[in-house]
C-alpha cells in the first residue's frame, strides 16, 4: 500500500517543526492523516481566460475539505498570447510552458502533496500543467475556466459573430472604416473565458477530455454559464476519491500515466484532427507524452492524420460555429462518439470518472438518446451580456444541434473532409516534418508552388507584407523563429492575418520554423524541423527558390538539387560562429530566454528540453 507522500512532513516526532508550520496554515490535529491535495490555480488579471478564476480555487478547496481531504492552493503564471502577440512579449509564451511545469513540480515536491486539481485555461497553462501531471504521476483532475462567448456586432445592417482574430484582420484592412474597426474591437471578446473559437486554449482543454483527465464539458461549456460551477465542485470531490483509490486501495489506475496511456494519446490526436484543432496541440501532445515516457511521436500523428476525417469545423476555419455551438451539438463526447462509431478510437481506455471511454460515450453522447440531465447540460448557451464573472448566467438553447448531416458535428459519412483537419508534411524543406492545419486551407491551394520570399524574423515579415513586398503566388518564408532560433518559437498570427488583410490569404503560402496561433488559417505551415538555428534546410532557402507544397501527398520541397543544397550548406558552415544565425536581425534576447534556447529541441520533439545535454 503506497504511503501518503505528505506523511514525510506530517508524521513523526522529527517533523514537529513542519507540523507547526502546517498548523499556521490552518491545519488541525485531525488533518495530519488526510491526503493533502494541491489546488493548482492560474488566476491572473492579465488574461480574460483566467480573470474569473480568483475565487474558484477556494470553491474547489471547500469541496475537497468536505470530501475528507486537506486543500492547499497555489498559483502559476499565465501568459496571454493575444496580448503578447506581435512584439517581443511573444518570445516568452512557449518558454512559460516549461516554467509552469517546473513550478508545479517544485511546489508539489517541496511540500509533498498527495494529489492535485489543476485549474487551467489558456494556451500554455493547460499543457504546462499536463506536463507536470505526467512528470509527477500523482492523482490529478483538470478543470478549465471554460471558453468565452462568441462576440456579436452589427456591420452593414447585419449581425455577425466574431472573435479576436476578426479584430486583428479588420484593423489591418484599409477598406474597413475606423468606426467598424472600433465596433469589432469592442465586441470581439465580450466575456471572461478562453477565446471563443477552436484556438489553442480550447483545443487543449478539449484534449484533456480525450486523454481522460477531465470531465465531460470541460472543453466546451461556457465560462459564464452556471452549469460550469458543478464541474469545479465535482472536481473537488473526485480528486479525493482518486487519492483514496491510490493511497488506500493501491489502485494505480487512478494515476495519470495509467489513464493517459499511448492509446489515450492516439484518441487525443484523433480528436484534434477531427475537430480541426490548433497546430500547437501537436507540439504540446508530443511534450506531454515525453514527460510521461509515452512512446508517441510525429510518425504516429502522421499515421492518424491519414485515417481520421474532419467531423467538426469551428472558428477560425468558419465564422458559422464557435465553442458555444460545439457544446450545443453535444461537446467533445459527441465528436468522440462519431469517431468511435467510425472505428477510430480505443474505447477501453479509462478516465477520471472511473468509466471506460465506451461507457462515457454511452452515457453522455447526445446522439444516443441520453438522459434529460445530459440534454439539459448540453443545452447551456450564451447569455449575451459582457461580463468578467464566472457562472453569471443560465441561458439555454431551445434545442440541441443533433443534425449530423449538416450541423456543427457530423458523422464520418457526412464529414467536412475525409482528409482530417491536420497534416504532417515532409521533404527536403522539413526533413523531420512540419504541420499544417488543413481545416483552414482553401481547397484551391491544397497544392501550391511559388517563389520564396525570405524573411529572417516575424517583424521583417510583417513589414514586408504590409509594405507590398509579397505578391500573389509567393511563398513567404519566416525563419529563425523556432524554439532555439527565436528563441521561444513565436506565433505568426500577425503575418497570417495581414496576408488576409492584403487580399493574399488564398493566393500565398507562409512557411516557418515558428508556430501559429490557433487563430491562424490559410496555407500556414509551421513547426518546420529541424529549425534554421539547428541547421535545418529552411535556413538555406534563397529568395526566388521554387517551393512546392502538396498536402494530399504530404510533401514539401525546395525545388533545387541535392548538390546545390550541399553547396549552400558548406557555405553556411564556413561562417563559423555566424552560421545558422539570422542576418541583420535586431532583437534583445534576455538571459532567461538564452538559457531556454540552450536546451530547446526543435518542434518535432515538442520543443522540450534536450535531455542529452543534461546527461540523460
UniProtKB/Swiss-Prot annotation:
Enzyme Commission no: 4.2.1.9
Cofactor: [2Fe-2S] cluster; Mg(2+)
Residues the record lists as binding [2Fe-2S] cluster: 122, 195
Binding positions (Mg(2+)): 81, 123-124, 491
Pfam family for this entry, one: ILV_EDD_C
PROSITE patterns in alphabetical order: ILVD_EDD_1 (PS00886), ILVD_EDD_2 (PS00887)
UniProt remark on cofactor binding: Binds 1 [2Fe-2S] cluster per subunit. This cluster acts as a Lewis acid cofactor.
Active site: 517 (proton acceptor)
Biological processes, Gene Ontology terms: isoleucine biosynthetic process; L-valine biosynthetic process
An MF annotation (GO) of this entry: dihydroxy-acid dehydratase activity
Gene3D superfamilies per the UniProt record, alphabetical: IlvD/EDD C-terminal domain-like
InterPro entries cross-referenced by the UniProt entry: Dihydro-acid_dehy_C, DihydroxyA_deHydtase, DiOHA_6PGluconate_deHydtase_CS, ILV_EDD_C, ILV_EDD_N, IlvD/EDD_N
Catalytic activity: (2R)-2,3-dihydroxy-3-methylbutanoate = 3-methyl-2-oxobutanoate + H2O; (2R,3R)-2,3-dihydroxy-3-methylpentanoate = (S)-3-methyl-2-oxopentanoate + H2O
Pathway: Amino-acid biosynthesis; L-isoleucine biosynthesis; L-isoleucine from 2-oxobutanoate: step 3/4; Amino-acid biosynthesis; L-valine biosynthesis; L-valine from pyruvate: step 3/4
Single GO cellular component term: cytosol
Protein family according to the UniProt entry: Belongs to the IlvD/Edd family.
Function per UniProt: Functions in the biosynthesis of branched-chain amino acids. Catalyzes the dehydration of (2R,3R)-2,3-dihydroxy-3-methylpentanoate (2,3-dihydroxy-3-methylvalerate) into 2-oxo-3-methylpentanoate (2-oxo-3-methylvalerate) and of (2R)-2,3-dihydroxy-3-methylbutanoate (2,3-dihydroxyisovalerate) into 2-oxo-3-methylbutanoate (2-oxoisovalerate), the penultimate precursor to L-isoleucine and L-valine, respectively.
HAMAP family: IlvD (MF_00012)
Name under which the protein is recorded: Dihydroxy-acid dehydratase
Encoding gene (name): ilvD
Amino acid at each position: 500500500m503506497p504511503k501518503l507522500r505528505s506523511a514525510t512532513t506530517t508524521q513523526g516526532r522529527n517533523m514537529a517543526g513542519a507540523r507547526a508550520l502546517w498548523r499556521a496554515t490552518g491545519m488541525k490535529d485531525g488533518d495530519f492523516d488526510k491526503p493533502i491535495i494541491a489546488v493548482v490555480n492560474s488566476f491572473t488579471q492579465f488574461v480574460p481566460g483566467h480573470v474569473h478564476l480568483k475565487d474558484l480555487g477556494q470553491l474547489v478547496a471547500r469541496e475537497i475539505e468536505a470530501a475528507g481531504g486537506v486543500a492547499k492552493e497555489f498559483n502559476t503564471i499565465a501568459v496571454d498570447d493575444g496580448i503578447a502577440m506581435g512584439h517581443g512579449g511573444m518570445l516568452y509564451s512557449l518558454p512559460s510552458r516549461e516554467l509552469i511545469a517546473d513550478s508545479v513540480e517544485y511546489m508539489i515536491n517541496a511540500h509533498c502533496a498527495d494529489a492535485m486539481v489543476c485549474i487551467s485555461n489558456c494556451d500554455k497553462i493547460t499543457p504546462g500543467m499536463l506536463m507536470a501531471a505526467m512528470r509527477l504521476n500523482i492523482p490529478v483532475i483538470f478543470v478549465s475556466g471554460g471558453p468565452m462567448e462568441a462576440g456579436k456586432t452589427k456591420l452593414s445592417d447585419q449581425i455577425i459573430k466574431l472573435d479576436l482574430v476578426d479584430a486583428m484582420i479588420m484593423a489591418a484592412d484599409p477598406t474597413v472604416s475606423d468606426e467598424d474597426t472600433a465596433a469589432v474591437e469592442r465586441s470581439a471578446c465580450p466575456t471572461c473565458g478562453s477565446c471563443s473559437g477552436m484556438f489553442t486554449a480550447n483545443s487543449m482543454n478539449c484534449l484533456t477530455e480525450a486523454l481522460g483527465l477531465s470531465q465531460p464539458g470541460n472543453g466546451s461549456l461556457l465560462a459564464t454559464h452556471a452549469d460550469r460551477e458543478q464541474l469545479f465542485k465535482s472536481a473537488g470531490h473526485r480528486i479525493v476519491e482518486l487519492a483514496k483509490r491510490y493511497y488506500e486501495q493501491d489502485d494505480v489506475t487512478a494515476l495519470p500515466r495509467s489513464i493517459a496511456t499511448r492509446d489515450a494519446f492516439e484518441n487525443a490526436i484523433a480528436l484534434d484532427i477531427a475537430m480541426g484543432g490548433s497546430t500547437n496541440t501537436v507540439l504540446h501532445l508530443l511534450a506531454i507524452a515525453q514527460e510521461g515516457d509515452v512512446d508517441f511521436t510525429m510518425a504516429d500523428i502522421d499515421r492518424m492524420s491519414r485515417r481520421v476525417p474532419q467531423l467538426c469545423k469551428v472558428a477560425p476555419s468558419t465564422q458559422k460555429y464557435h465553442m458555444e455551438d460545439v457544446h450545443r451539438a453535444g461537446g467533445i463526447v459527441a465528436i468522440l462518439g462519431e469517431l468511435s462509431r467510425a472505428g477510430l478510437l480505443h474505447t477501453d481506455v479509462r478516465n477520471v470518472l472511473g468509466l471506460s471511454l465506451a461507457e462515457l460515450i454511452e452515457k453522455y453522447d447526445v446522439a444516443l438518446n441520453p438522459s434529460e440531465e445530459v440534454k439539459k447540460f448540453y443545452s447551456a448557451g450564451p447569455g449575451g451580456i459582457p461580463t468578467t464573472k464566472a457562472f453569471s448566467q443560465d441561458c439555454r438553447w431551445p434545442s440541441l444541434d443533433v443534425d449530423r448531416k449538416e450541423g456543427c458535428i457530423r458523422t464520418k459519412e457526412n464529414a467536412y473532409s475525409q482528409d482530417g483537419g491536420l497534416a504532417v508534411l515532409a521533404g527536403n524543406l522539413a526533413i523531420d516534418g512540419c504541420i499544417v492545419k488543413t481545416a483552414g486551407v482553401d481547397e484551391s491551394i491544397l497544392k501550391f508552388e511559388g517563389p520564396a520570399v525570405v524573411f529572417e524574423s516575424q517583424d521583417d515579415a510583417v513589414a514586408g507584407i504590409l509594405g507590398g513586398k509579397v505578391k500573389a503566388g509567393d511563398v513567404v518564408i519566416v525563419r529563425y523563429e523556432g524554439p532555439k532560433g527565436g528563441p521561444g518559437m513565436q506565433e505568426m498570427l500577425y503575418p497570417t492575418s495581414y496576408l488576409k488583410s492584403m487580399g493574399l490569404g488564398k493566393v500565398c503560402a507562409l512557411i516557418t520554423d515558428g508556430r501559429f496561433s490557433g487563430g491562424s488559417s490559410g496555407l500556414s505551415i509551421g513547426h518546420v524541423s529541424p529549425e534554421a538555428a539547428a541547421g535545418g534546410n529552411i535556413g538555406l532557402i534563397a529568395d526566388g527558390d521554387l517551393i512546392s507544397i502538396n498536402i494530399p501527398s504530404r510533401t514539401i520541397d525546395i525545388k533545387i538539387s541535392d548538390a546545390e543544397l550541399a553547396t549552400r550548406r558548406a557555405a553556411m558552415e564556413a561562417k563559423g560562429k555566424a552560421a545558422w544565425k539570422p542576418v541583420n536581425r535586431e532583437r534583445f534576447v534576455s538571459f532567461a530566454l538564452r538559457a531556454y534556447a540552450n536546451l530547446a529541441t526543435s518542434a518535432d520533439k515538442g520543443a522540450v528540453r534536450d535531455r542529452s545535454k543534461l546527461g540523460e
